[in-house]
Amino acid sequence: MSEPKKLNYFEKKEQNKAHAQQVIRWASKNREKEIQALSEATVLMPAPSVTPEGQVKFEKTEIEVMQCSTVDAIIRETERGARVCALNFASYKNPGGMFTDGSMAQEESLCHASILYPVLCSDRVRSLFYDRHKGNLNKALYLSDMLYTPDVPFWQGGVETKASIITCAAPNKKAAQTYQKVPDDLCKLAMEDRIAAVLHTADVNQEDALILGAFGCGVFGNDVREVAEIFRDQLECAFRGTFKRVVFAVLDHPSYEIMASVYPAATHQEIEKEESGCCDMGTN
């Protein structure tokens, strides 16, 4: 039997666009009430007014660094019996990022495997989060407000599960430095504030198991090591003992290696899988 044809970049993009439309149609037909309920359950978490500190609930936080997609980690962690909360590396202005245009970054991959996209596109969520950002880009560093959506259905390989989602945009370091000449120290400070706000959101919503990753380290141009070290410092200081388990899901191998080096005492797993892409949809 001959191997399937390997798609080039443009063919993959067209395939992703087609699957995005399929997800949208399927969700509208089969999950309309659930989408409405999730939209109503989504809450805006404003930026903390003071430096947040987490509740101490556990003697130690178990940390694992995995080479896999966020969706892979969601499926794996829920199969372990955990209630899971995952960070969506979101667009500041556009629900789902470039989901309908065929891109496949972290946010888009979440949308391909869930009903997250129509929830983010709902009128209520748009007005709650995206509309308030118009004209308020903060020199491309954006703001530390975010959305919390509980129990979003995800599916992969015939398995359906649920995970709560924190939708938050990282500082766009590349744009901030290219167009606004923002210095490194202010970019780092913005990322420190953003990560503290993400962990605060998970804490106040009583989440114990988090899936994080190389937040903002793609087109936004943040440094993987710096982001990993900020997460480490927050989890060892202000949020020490706040979470039972934290998984860093990093699909790109070089970024995985850097992340793993920052957490030498953590469990490391290289999970060789095909590139994260279109996923089969759940049942009615």
Feature map (PLM): residue ranges:
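Macrodomain-like recognition of ADP-ribose-binding/processing modules
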Residues: 1-210, 214-284
